Amino acid sequence: MIKRVNKLVIGISLLFLVISITAGCGMGKEEEIKKSFEKTLSMYPIKNLEDLYDKKGYRDDQFDKNDKGTWIVRSSMSIQPNGKDMNVKGMVLYMIRNTRTTNGYYYVDVIEREDKGIHRDNEKRYPVKMVDNKIIPTKEIEDEKIKKEIENFKFFVQYGNFKDLSKYKDGDISYNPEAPIYSAKYQLTNNDYNVKQLRKRYNIPTNKAPKLLLKGTGNLKGSSVGYKDIEFTFVEKKGENIYFSDSLHLEPSEDK
């Protein structure tokens, strides 16, 4: 009887040990992922985008020694009401540090429903550049609505704030070291600062609080190969999707 009790105690102890080790590893990877993103997210907000010309970012052997790199700034909102087409609006800006010049485009896309028999998007691009921290079209635009949208556009990096990133806990963590691919997902509330900012700027047709997804590829400690994206997912299901995407990344300048 005593032997059975001892075996049971040992078994329970080993079980708790395994659970503790597994939990510890998960928490460790979560902190690694957050720390990897924090290098970039700690720069938010950058109200004057021209300040990026003086920010070095992560560099590795993919950069030529004389190349300061190009910052790539992206923000977009995608809205697909239930059973309808998806409407996407966003902007991409390339900021070349060596020449302190920019080029990019504002885009509008309508992605048709798959139940129409074909998957087709209808992206239209409007080339832009930045002058004195203002985005301006480089070609004539007849559509006054599009002109106004470009004039009023702000990248998320200009108003987002992740000072509370370290407070996000118990995320849904995914990590594949072979690819490598990694992500951390957190449920937010509508009282979250960044959620309030998005609702202030976009007509988001749902009261649901979003999930924040930090997703990336490449070495967790830093790499110019791969990407790091953030996404606020308000709705994600078949036939209905609402999400906001953003990224800020330094890459070698060739072909920009």
Swiss-Prot record:
Residues with a covalently attached lipid (N-palmitoyl cysteine): C25
InterPro entries attached to this UniProt entry: Csa, Csa_sf
Short name of one Pfam family: DUF576
Top-level taxon in the UniProt lineage: Bacteria
Signal peptide: 1-24
One cellular component (GO) term of this entry: plasma membrane
Primary location recorded for the protein, binned into one broad class: membrane
Lipoprotein listed as a keyword: yes
Keyword Lipoprotein carried by entry: yes
Keywords annotated in UniProt: Cell membrane, Lipoprotein, Membrane, Palmitate, Signal
Compartment list: Cell membrane
Residue positions of covalent lipid attachment, annotated as S-diacylglycerol cysteine: C25
UniProt topology in membrane: Lipid-anchor
Family listed: Belongs to the staphylococcal tandem lipoprotein family.
Protein name per UniProt: Uncharacterized lipoprotein SAB0040
Lineage, uppermost ranks: Bacteria, Bacillati, Bacillota, Bacilli, Bacillales
